[in-house]
Swiss-Prot record:
The gene is fabA. InterPro entries: FabA, FabA_FabZ, HotDog_dom_sf. CDD domains: FabA. Pathway: Lipid metabolism; fatty acid biosynthesis. This is 3-hydroxydecanoyl-[acyl-carrier-protein] dehydratase. Belongs to the thioester dehydratase family. FabA subfamily.
Amino acid sequence: MTKQNAFTREDLLRCSRGELFGPGNAQLPAPNMLMVDRITHISEEGGKYGKGELVAELDITPDLWFFACHFEGDPVMPGCLGLDAMWQLVGFFLGWQGLPGRGRALGSGEVKFFGQVLPTAKKVTYNIQIKRVLKGKLNLAIADGSVSVDGREIYTAEGLRVGVFTSTDNF
């Protein structure tokens, strides 16, 4: 059976409700924290490290919730939302691979911001390059990611780490 390699907004909303990978497994956040409209490509092969990659997009409109409050008179998408979107996608990758448990961001290495998303932008593109997937007692993915706005790279993150846990009682 061939794995689905692209996901629509409705697919991602199903994932936020726990319906895509099953109860107790990886979920995306619900809107407003869902920072992705579609995954245009996901693969467990290829990419910069040969371990898999994801490409996803967020459509930008001036009425997105964060522009009204960050900042009044100087609207810009918070950089932390782009970083969170990259963690969301690494967790999605683990669920897509069939690894059980609830996703949790575990950290990252170096993060750089050198651009911004303004209300005049049209599209944000996320590019995730999987470096390593550990399967066993701990299921964990390590990836590098970038965020581009209208084709121009504006953020990078190295060593994004996300794990999936069958119990989060002691987390």
